[in-house]
């Protein structure tokens, strides 16, 4: 056992030289604790037995300033040493390896000034001196300067002076201290912040019910507070909540007004409510029947109703009278027993883009018009065979008289040829298209139309002399080997395109190669046989009544006196663009379908003369120029 020397001047360098009693039954922990205390420059007294520590305290309590004791001791409980230390008015620090809540709470309740957990750190031991100062404030106050020593609270001094031998204070002193504390609390209550009111859902429902009962205009905080009758709620709380509630209602009203304002055109002008619905086409078709000429002038536009220009609705395109401006003239033509061909407009053409036709109310509206002048069906020369068939461009379909769509019909032949077509066609070479494996009748089509889908050509012409399996593809045959259903051409119907806005039939220059690709020269015998078959016309008078001009395509059973030479045309393929010189002459008696008194200046004669001049001057005439087309596609 070691005892630190006590000196009268120990407070001069406090906490250096503070006397500490260390008690622990574990020698390792005790040695570690001693080293740390010495590093703090404390005077250390250590022991491993609690009984010896008690004897030292009882002999001279003024020998130590602080006691550090382990809780668990083998001979005596650590709390027993704590009680003795408190009797001697010494600060006691409990040391233990257990850091649980119950152990710490037990040590603090029994009077320990601090509770340290093993292993103890250096910083913790450096701050244990303030416990000594708390117990001896009067003695350690002398260490302070005179100015600071006077500022020590008087209450602490009184309490320290009136401490009796047992360490208890008088009851009167406690009452005085309680009264002073209550007065201080009362003085601070005026400056204390008021508790905040939390508006729960139930409290807000009572508030809303009170406002609805009074009315929003007459609701004031005092009346609302009386109706709510809730303790702890002040008038200021109700006033603040009422202001927030009114702002909330104002925002809701503004949001509803914004939703009701039209914003389709990026503006809030209420005048857009007065706009009519997009239903102009119904009024357009019901107001006036479109004239058959296919052209609307300004006088026609002024008679139409105004809603036509204000809006356009695609639902108004159901009426067939808006599209088919010439359908009512020749739609009732019937097939005669002599084999008259019919050409009519489709009543089901609906997919037409009308926005391009109605760009301005002051511009004349042009509607589709079928315009074709066809001359007499006579025996023509080689030039008519080479050029007139391509210029006619009459698409022959099945017996169906309607098209599903003008823009999607695969059999519709369009052209950019703007001159009236007075050229007659002759010598059309048909071909048979089909597959050998198909047991049905082969499909019959004209040359140049083979690039189009052939689903609507089925059933037009049936062959009786050739079985389907024995005919190769694109095989040329003679007209006398083909029979038509009903021994006439009454069942065959030609369709006229209503797609051209200019009113004239057009043909795509890209179709030239397709038309002329398969018009290969046959043997002299085959051409002569074909020409011979044309001498006796078995079909009688063939007419092509067109709805726009009522021009008739006739054959007056005139005989063909001129034969066709086998050198009529050279083979044309994708790499050749020239046609050989024809060897036959034109029929001088060829006339157009006009009356005799109107034949002084025939357009057909002018066209044929121009073609002869070009052939004589150039020798070899390009295909595109030969047939009346430019060598490049029109813009």
UniProtKB/Swiss-Prot annotation:
Annotated compartments: Nucleus
Ranges annotated as biased composition (Acidic residues): 166-186
Domain Response regulatory: 19-133
Any one Gene Ontology BP term: phosphorelay signal transduction system
Portion annotated as DNA-binding: 196-246
Keyword Cell wall biogenesis/degradation: no
Region described as Disordered: 144-196, 323-342
Sequence positions bearing 4-aspartylphosphate: 70
PTM description: Two-component system major event consists of a His-to-Asp phosphorelay between a sensor histidine kinase (HK) and a response regulator (RR). In plants, the His-to-Asp phosphorelay involves an additional intermediate named Histidine-containing phosphotransfer protein (HPt). This multistep phosphorelay consists of a His-Asp-His-Asp sequential transfer of a phosphate group between first a His and an Asp of the HK protein, followed by the transfer to a conserved His of the HPt protein and finally the transfer to an Asp in the receiver domain of the RR protein.
Top-level taxon: Eukaryota
Keywords linked to the UniProt accession: Activator, Cytokinin signaling pathway, DNA-binding, Nucleus, Phosphoprotein, Transcription, Transcription regulation, Two-component regulatory system
Main location: nucleus
Listed CDD domains: REC_typeB_ARR-like
A single Gene Ontology CC term: nucleus
Function recorded in the entry: Transcriptional activator that binds specifically to the DNA sequence 5'-[AG]GATT-3'. Functions as a response regulator involved in His-to-Asp phosphorelay signal transduction system. Phosphorylation of the Asp residue in the receiver domain activates the ability of the protein to promote the transcription of target genes. Could directly activate some type-A response regulators in response to cytokinins.
Assembly: Binds the target DNA as a monomer.
Similarity comment: family membership: Belongs to the ARR family. Type-B subfamily.
PANTHER family attached to this UniProt entry: TWO-COMPONENT RESPONSE REGULATOR (PTHR43874), TWO-COMPONENT RESPONSE REGULATOR ARR18 (PTHR43874:SF208)
Protein name: Two-component response regulator ARR18
Originating species: Arabidopsis thaliana (Mouse-ear cress)
């Amino acid at each position: 056992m070691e005892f630190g020397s006590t000196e009268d001047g120990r407070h001069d360098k406090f906490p250096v030289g503070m006397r500490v009693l260390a008690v622990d039954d574990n020698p390792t922990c005790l040695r570690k604790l001693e080293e740390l205390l010495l590093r703090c420059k404390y005077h250390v007294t250590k022991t491993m037995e609690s009984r010896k520590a008690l004897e030292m305290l009882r002999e001279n309590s003024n020998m130590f300033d602080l006691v550090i004791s382990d809780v668990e001791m083998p001979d005596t409980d650590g709390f027993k040493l704590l009680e003795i230390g408190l009797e001697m008015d010494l600060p006691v620090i409990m040391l233990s390896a257990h850091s649980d809540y119950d152990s710490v709470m037990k040590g603090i309740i029994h009077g320990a000034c601090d509770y340290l957990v093993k292993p103890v750190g250096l910083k913790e031991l450096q701050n244990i001196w303030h416990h000594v100062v708390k117990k001896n404030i009067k003695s350690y106050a002398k260490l302070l300067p005179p100015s600071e020593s006077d500022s020590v609270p008087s209450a602490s001094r009184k309490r320290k002076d009136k401490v009796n031998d047992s360490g208890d204070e008088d009851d009167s002193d406690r009452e005085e201290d309680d009264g002073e504390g209550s007065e201080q609390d009362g003085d601070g209550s005026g400056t204390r912040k008021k508790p905040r009111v939390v508006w729960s859902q139930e409290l807000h429902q009572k508030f809303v019910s009170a406002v609805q009962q009074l009315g929003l205009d007459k609701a004031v905080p005092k009346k609302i507070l009386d109706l709510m009758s809730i303790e702890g709620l002040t008038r200021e709380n109700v006033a603040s909540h009422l202001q927030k509630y009114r702002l909330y209602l104002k925002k809701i009203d503004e949001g509803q007004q914004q939703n009701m304002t039209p914003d389709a055109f990026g503006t809030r002008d209420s005048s857009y409510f007065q706009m009519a619905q997009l239903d102009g086409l119904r009024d357009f078709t019901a107001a006036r029947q479109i004239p058959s000429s296919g052209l609307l002038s300004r006088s026609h536009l002024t008679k139409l109703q105004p809603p036509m220009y204000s809006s356009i609705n695609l639902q108004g395109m159901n009426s067939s009278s808006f599209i088919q401006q010439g359908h009512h003239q020749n739609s009732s033509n019937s097939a005669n027993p002599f084999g008259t061909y019919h050409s009519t407009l489709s009543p089901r053409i609906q997919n037409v883009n009308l926005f391009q036709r109605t760009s301005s109310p002051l511009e004349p509206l042009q509607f589709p018009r079928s315009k074709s002048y066809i001359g007499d069906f006579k025996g023509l020369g080689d030039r008519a065979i080479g050029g007139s068939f391509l210029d006619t461009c009459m698409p022959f379909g099945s017996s169906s008289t309607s098209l599903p769509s003008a823009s999607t019909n695969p059999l519709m032949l369009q052209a950019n040829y703007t001159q009236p077509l007075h050229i007659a066609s002759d010598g059309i070479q048909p071909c048979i298209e089909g597959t050998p494996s198909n047991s049905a009748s082969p499909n019959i089509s004209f040359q140049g139309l083979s690039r189009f889908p052939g689903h609507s050509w089925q059933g037009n012409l049936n062959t009786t002399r050739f079985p389907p399996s024995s005919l190769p593809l694109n095989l040329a045959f003679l007209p006398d080997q083909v029979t038509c259903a009903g021994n006439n051409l009454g069942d065959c119907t030609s369709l006229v395109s209503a797609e051209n806005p200019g009113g004239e039939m057009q043909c795509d220059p890209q179709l030239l190669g397709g038309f002329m690709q398969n018009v290969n020269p046959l043997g002299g015998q085959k051409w002569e046989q074909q020409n011979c078959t044309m001498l006796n016309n078995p079909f009688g008078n063939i007419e092509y009544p067109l709805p726009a001009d009522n021009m008739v395509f006739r054959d007056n059973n005139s005989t063909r006196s001129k034969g066709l030479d086998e050198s009529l045309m050279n083979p044309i393929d994708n790499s050749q663009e020239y046609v050989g010189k024809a060897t036959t002459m034109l029929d001088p008696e060829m006339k157009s379908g006009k009356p005799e008194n109107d034949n002084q200046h025939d357009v057909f004669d002018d066209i044929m003369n121009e073609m002869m001049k070009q052939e004589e001057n150039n020798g070899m005439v390009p295909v595109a120029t030969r047939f009346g087309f430019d060598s490049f596609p029109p813009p």
